[in-house]
Amino acid sequence: MSLIHPIQAVVSNRSGELIFAVLKNVIIAYRYDQTNGKYLEMGKWEDQFSRDEMIKIAVVKEQARQLAENEEKGIKKSKTNEGNTIEKKHDAKIPVPGPGAPPIYSQIRNLMISNDETMLLACADSDKSVLVFKIETLNNDNCLKLIKRQPFPKRPNAITITEDDKTVIIADKFGDVYSMLIESPVIENIDEEFEPILGHVSMLTGVLSTTNNGMKFVMTSDRDEHIKISHFPQSYIVDKWLFGHKEFVSSICIPSWNSNILVSAGGDHGIFLWDWIKGEKLDEFDFTDLVLPYINENHLAPDRFQNEENDLKEFAVSKLVSLPNNPYFAFFVEATKLLIILEVDQSTYKMKLLQKIVLPYYITFISTFSDDKTMGFNISLDNRESGDKDFVKFIALDTTSNTFSIKEEQSDEFNTSIVNSFSKEDSIVKVELDEVYPLYNIISLKKHGEHYS
């Protein structure tokens, strides 16, 4: 029996009125109508890019390069008996994965909204591109207008946008960072025309853009436990490194209520709070005891790294977010149902547990909403066993009691809208249980003995 694919990511504008979600290779947009409490579909975009076509272009390009190289070396072409050159005319062969090869997924990643809330950004695995959509709220047919699709040499792992919303900064899986002006023309010859603005020697996992005293900075995190702070756009000037992590860093954020603070998390079993201006670690919050009751068989280490008892479990923070205008952070450990909310004492910069919330299914993504009326978190869930229920939960702060709670009625309305949008059996996001895209990739960043040899 087919099911609607779980939501991989969900983000909203500050008021929470506009919601954008990713299901498989589809982005869908909704508007919350406060008069009747319903969610109205505002637009939809499906990534229809053909990976085969991209591979074919690469094969043709390589064939042309080899022919040119052969001519340069003086290698003779095949000729007829009359001495005429035989032109080989055939289509480029597209490599086909052999038996047992892992499936290829056309994921959409890194969903985010620009600071002025007029653009939606994402990354497409199909052609390793950054997608820029204009959000046309007055367009009743489809509010998502693709205005730029820029492929990159390697797959983007993380993106951010500068405060003026003019430049996207891209960190890829091979350790390179690029910048892209949104209004610049699309670059076709990406291997020759794109130059990294900075680099690491390992896979990049996060990137941020910020300013301090009129100076611009870009912050990057990687698999090698590093956080690097560089000037921007003079990114060859390294301001400092933040050392303290012993495992990979998977998530970094800067709170809007104090831009001198940076919070980081990953394979270590703690949340790190930094004064990045001074390069000092201010505090570390150990969450081990909080999450241990929620660690399960999904966290068993790979067989080749298991202990003799076969009970070694490994876990890591998947994503960490800061609630605007309030000294709160929220995070979750990959493949768990537990959302942990921390509060920061702004006089001592010490973190303490504010609240734990247990969700009905494993959390896959978290983002925030916050304006003068309401604030809280958008949570997407791995609901594959739910019978097409509980795709998303909205969690809001009650300022009177200073506690967070799930907005069940509003969450149910959104989930109903998802079902209505994708209920047809031929829907692109309908899959079998074993066809669900991989949702838990963070712990694969962990290094074992083989990585240090």
Swiss-Prot record:
Region of interest: Disordered: 69-99
InterPro entries reported in the protein's UniProt record: Trm82, WD40/YVTN_repeat-like_dom_sf, WD40_repeat_dom_sf, WD40_rpt
WD repeats: 103-143, 244-286
Superkingdom of the organism of origin: Eukaryota
PROSITE patterns in the record: WD_REPEATS_2 (PS50082), WD_REPEATS_REGION (PS50294)
Gene Ontology biological-process annotations: tRNA (guanine-N7)-methylation
Gene Ontology cellular component terms for the protein in this record: cytosol; nucleus; tRNA (m7G46) methyltransferase complex
Pathway: tRNA modification; N(7)-methylguanine-tRNA biosynthesis
Location, primary (coarse class): nucleus
Subcellular location: Nucleus
This protein's record includes keyword tRNA processing: yes
Gene Ontology MF: a single term: enzyme activator activity
UniProt keyword annotations, A-Z: Nucleus, Repeat, tRNA processing, WD repeat
Assigned protein family: Belongs to the WD repeat TRM82 family.
HAMAP family listed in its UniProt record: TRM82 (MF_03056)
Function: Required for the formation of N(7)-methylguanine at position 46 (m7G46) in tRNA. In the complex, it is required to stabilize and induce conformational changes of the catalytic subunit.
Subunit note: Forms a heterodimer with the catalytic subunit TRM8.
Protein name listed in UniProt: tRNA (guanine-N(7)-)-methyltransferase non-catalytic subunit TRM82
